[in-house]
Amino acid sequence: MSSEDQFPRQVDLLIPPNSTATFRGVYVMDRPARIHSLRGHMHLRGKYQIIEAVYPDGRWELINKLNWHHGWQTAFLYEDHVMPLLPKGTVLMVTNIFDNTVDNPQNPDPNQWIVRGDRTVDEMSHTRLGITYFDNEQDFEELVRERAQLNRSRLQAGG
């Protein structure tokens, strides 16, 4: 089963006129991984896509917050030293915030009910994550140690 099968499909997405709406999906990592890229997608009422991680030890981290613009259809690639490292059991949360009000300059008509659909005037959202899974916990832990050492070295060097 792919991670795409784990997230809600938002078939019940419904945004009332002149309002905002928030939808959230979660996925629990069944093995350690790192995120090397992400690509969000929403339509005209999309405002933000927020990707967060809740780690098994209870720590929380903001992975990315995309200030959405429908004309932006590109991927974000992480450099090696900042790729999020996710241990097994990490909960990934993707929050999508929609703005169907006059405050949204992309919104063609805030007086419309908005439903899930493929047309630009409908709404949808998905987030594609480029993930590399580790089959070996030791390899993952070694990368975590190397990253920690690199960060300590950068701090000591003043950067």
Task: Give the location of each predicted region.
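His-enriched metal-coordination microenvironments in redox/metal-binding proteins
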Residues: 1-140, 147-159
